[in-house]
């Protein structure tokens, strides 16, 4: 499900969700200047990709990592007090599969989740109190 400030594609163009509402049994979203039922055609998630990661400050490390027999490229984002490691595989059933590991303040505190889409990455960042990163992605 989508959340406020998530980025999605609407008719092939990236749009940010600026409001969500429920009326009766239908969910509506507002994408910048467009308001409509979420079930309408045209809204699609954005797949996590290597170009997206590079555009948003992740650095590709020349290291191939294996999880559950799948090969993943390693991307790293470093900032004050935390390290984000994102491992992204080649296509698996039509989708890139990403595995996100966030270490905060050099402690054992971390989140380890599997993701496919940009809005899922945004929501994982928000859960780790990295709202400013989640809400400022470049598409």
Residue ranges and their predicted role:
Residues 58-64, 136-139:
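Short amphipathic alpha-helical segments with coiled-coil-like heptad repeat character
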Residues 6, 51, 56, 73-75:
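Residue-level detector of beta-strand structural context in well-folded domains
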Residues 34-62, 112-128:
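Intrinsically disordered, low-complexity, charged/polar segments
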Residues 125, 129-139:
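Charged phosphate-binding loop/patch that engages nucleotide di/tri-phosphates or the phosphate backbone
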Residues 6, 13-26:
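Short beta-strand-centered aromatic/proline hotspots
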Residues 24-34, 38, 62-118:
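Acidic, low-complexity, intrinsically disordered interaction modules
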């Amino acid at each position: 499900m989508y959340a406020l400030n998530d980025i999605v594609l609407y008719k092939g163009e990236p749009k940010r969700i600026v409001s969500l509402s429920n009326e009766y049994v239908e969910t509506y979203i507002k994408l910048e200047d467009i308001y409509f039922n979420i079930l309408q055609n045209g809204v699609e998630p954005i797949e996590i990709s290597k170009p997206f990661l590079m555009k948003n400050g992740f650095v590709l490390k020349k290291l191939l990592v294996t999880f559950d027999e799948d090969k993943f490229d390693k991307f790293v984002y470093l900032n004050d007090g935390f390290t984000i490691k994102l491992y992204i595989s080649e296509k698996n059933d039509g989708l890139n599969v990403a595995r996100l590991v966030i270490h905060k303040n050099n402690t054992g505190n971390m989140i380890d989740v599997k993701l496919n889409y940009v809005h899922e990455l945004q929501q994982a960042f928000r859960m780790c109190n990295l709202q400013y990163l989640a809400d400022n992605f470049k598409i």
